[in-house]
């Protein structure tokens, strides 16, 4: 198992949205069960919000890529919420 897999773990959508807000992204709109978030500099990402499910590592890595942050750093911010 590589180091990134050890550090990345599933997270609740609520915690991911809080972490993105701490990074300066704001919820622009919601469509169905997805929240579209945008940073003032133009970076965007979409977060699925399903109350009984967690966001898996692959999607967390994709969200981190969308906003231009290292996945491990993003996980650290999520864990601080």
Q: Model segments located where?
A:
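N-terminal first-folded block
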Residues: 1-29
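Short, flexible active-site loop motifs that bind/organize anionic cofactors or intermediates
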Residues: 6, 50, 64
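A short, structured beta-strand/loop element
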Residues: 26-59
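C-terminal structural segments of small proteins and small subunits
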Residues: 55-81
């Amino acid at each position: 198992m590589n180091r990134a897999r050890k550090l990345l773990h599933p997270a609740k959508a609520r915690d991911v949205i809080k972490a993105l807000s701490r990074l300066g992204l704001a919820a622009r709109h919601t469509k169905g069960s997805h929240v579209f978030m945008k940073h003032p500099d133009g970076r965007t990402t979409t977060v699925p919000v399903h109350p009984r499910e967690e966001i898996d590592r692959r999607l967390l890595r994709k969200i981190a890529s969308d906003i231009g942050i290292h996945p491990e750093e993003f996980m650290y911010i999520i864990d601080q919420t």
